[in-house]
Design a protein with these regions (language model features):
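Polar, enzyme-active/binding microenvironments
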Residues: 1-170
Length: 170
């Protein structure tokens, strides 16, 4: 799917797409990637832009952050995100401003089972870790743990888990 508009204010995005690949980088894992609307990797010539709220809770400002390279996150084998075996459900994908307020702000991806993260608030994330231990349905997981970062929900994936919880085979 793609989301597109001109990022001229809070809440807007431009040239944003999301690709989820099951069985990547290994069998029973999945990888989500922030991409251009054309589903190509973001580049400096054709970046994705996302508007985030300020990284300061008491400030109403916003910042437009640009992704100019591959931005991805892997759901590792064994990480259940709160799912049990053979369960239907949804996984939400969030963009986070990993370095709010800095000149070199960076977009990273985060995932959660529940859409409980209000975009007007700041959140701390937990590292997914790659060891199959991301098992809570109410935690926002990212590649690296982050503290007090703005988030934007950029999509979701409907899934049915396999016979073993944490094996992302379908």
């Amino acid at each position: 799917f793609t989301v597109g508009s001109t990022p001229d204010g809070p809440g807007n995005t431009q040239n944003v797409g999301l690709v989820v690949t099951i069985g990547s980088p290994v069998s029973n894992a999945f990888t989500a990637r922030l991409v251009q609307r054309t589903l190509s990797t973001c580049t400096s010539a054709s970046p994705a832009r996302i508007s985030f709220r300020s990284g300061t809770q008491t400030t109403g400002d916003y910042a437009i952050v640009t992704a100019t390279e591959n931005v991805g996150l892997t759901g590792s084998v064994g990480s259940t995100f709160g799912f049990t075996s053979a369960e239907k459900g949804r996984i939400y994908f969030y963009a986070i401003n990993a370095n709010p307020g800095a000149a070199n702000s960076v977009i990273e991806l985060a995932i959660a089972r529940k859409a409980i993260f209000d975009e007007s608030q700041l959140y701390s994330t937990t590292a997914e870790g790659g060891a199959g231990a991301a098992d809570s349905d109410t935690v926002l997981y990212s590649t690296s743990a982050r503290a007090n970062v703005p988030v934007r929900c950029i999509g979701f994936m409907d899934i049915t888990t396999g016979a073993t919880a944490g094996n992302w085979s379908n």
